[in-house]
């Protein structure tokens, strides 16, 4: 076991078995290679899975994850995966434009850029388009300052944002270990969580 499995897969699997919640419309922010979209579509076969990522011509999309030299193959492989199930809808969209979205979602998975200001904006926008009793999950949450911070991969931004929102009683959140192996958890600066949050509707 490499320790690189993520507990978000277990969380999604558990939610798919829930008798108390219905997840008709699901939004994924950050498509990446499409495998998580495929997982969601298999776990929630009767749901609509909307997944968004930057346009393939966007400089950040091209340069993230060192994929610049293999960008065409990356896109081709991703699109093949996304085409496997009919309930997956891919949109090349900068998540900032969710500000103008009208559609509401039961479940939102935030896995785009992890630093300021983008993840903060993603969280606020997601709260605006969340249905009552809906859930938002955020990936790669550091609760202490990571060894290095950047706007894309590693940042304390998610934790700081949701902590302020909870302090004002706008949301409630819980943290779940992202990985369970000792290597990823013994060093607090490497330890990551998945945040599960719900909005307090007044």
Regions found by a protein language model. Give the residues of each.
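A short alpha-helical cap/connector motif
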Residues: 1-109, 113-202
